[in-house]
Swiss-Prot record:
Subunit structure comment from the entry: Homodimer.
GO MF entries: triose-phosphate isomerase activity
GO BP, one annotated term: glyceraldehyde-3-phosphate biosynthetic process
Keyword RNA-binding among record annotations: no
Organism annotation: Shewanella woodyi (strain ATCC 51908 / MS32)
Gene symbol of the encoding locus: tpiA
Residues annotated to bind substrate: N11, W12, K13, G181, S220, G241, G242
Cited HAMAP family: TIM_B
Protein name as annotated: Triosephosphate isomerase
Native organism taxonomy: Bacteria, Pseudomonadati, Pseudomonadota, Gammaproteobacteria, Alteromonadales
Length: 260
């Protein structure tokens, strides 16, 4: 069985501040115990530099604990007249290691199709970033028992456009749309069922990738349900939304992941 390091990725969405970055790192420096889990902060682009400064300032205090920086989105284009967009190279220059691709809010609010998501996935890898690909079904799709069908389609488009080894350097986040920001989380059993399907699906393309890829759960994860979710054999941590803005609760999730 592969030893997959758990990850807790905090997606601030359009929230946060430089002060929040400072507050988080102050607690990281005294509370994070080891490198058994990886912590990723994904602030709005304007605060990437604030997080980077805190990473540099607290490097010694973190004592080897794995705290990384990620972005919430990138352009599929390398450069050009794309007002308001940020390229993969720009994110790499800013110190990012990860970038969230295809979040349900981007797909729903900004019309990002699966083809666009696949292009952004490729752009991230081209510039040395690890994409965190979000997949998930809507409430009606789950009720119609189409969960696996929807997720398979979202995975297959990425493979078709980027090749069978596309997920060799990637992370997947399963975020059921009916749980994102609603306060209603999937049960541990529901999460495990879908994560196992994703792993099996990718194993059909590459057994190595299927066994080793990290699959996060995202959707109303809190300190009260994280332990049961993270204990599932195919759940490798969480993509965290609202709770990532509360330094105490987010640190609690990190501690739970480290002991999972």
């Amino acid at each position: 069985m592969a030893l997959r390091r758990p990850m807790v990725a905090g997606n601030w969405k359009m929230n946060g501040s430089a002060q929040l970055a400072q507050e988080l790192f102050k607690k990281f420096a005294t509370k994070l115990q080891n490198d058994s889990a990886e912590v990723v902060l994904c602030p709005p682009t304007i605060y990437l530099e604030s997080v980077r400064q805190q990473l540099d300032a607290n490097k010694e205090a973190l004592n080897g604990c794995l705290v990384r920086m990620g972005a919430q989105n990138l352009s599929q284009h390398d450069f050009g007249a794309y007002t308001g967009e940020v390229s993969g190279q720009m994110l790499k220059d800013s110190g990012c290691r990860y970038v969230i691709i295809g979040h349900s809010e981007r797909r729903r609010m900004y019309g990002e199709t699966s083809d666009i998501v696949a292009e952004k996935f490729a752009a991230a890898q081209k510039h040395g970033l690890t994409p965190i690909l979000c997949v998930g079904e809507s409430g009606p799709a789950r009720e119609a028992r189409r969960t696996f069908e929807v997720i398979a389609e979202e995975l297959d488009v990425v493979i078709e456009k980027n090749g069978t080894m596309a997920f060799d350097n990637a992370i997947i986040a399963y975020e059921p749309l009916w749980a994102v920001g609603t306060g209603k989380s999937a049960t541990p059993e529901q999460a495990q069922e879908v994560h196992a399907f994703i792993r099996k699906r990718l194993s059909e393309v590459s057994p190595f990738i299927g066994e080793n890829i990290r699959i996060l759960y995202g959707g109303s994860v809190t300190p009260s349900n994280a332990a049961d979710l993270f204990a599932q054999p195919d759940v490798d941590g969480g993509l965290i939304g609202g709770v990532s803005l509360n330094s105490t609760e987010f640190l609690s999730l990190c501690s739970i992941a480290m002991s999972a």
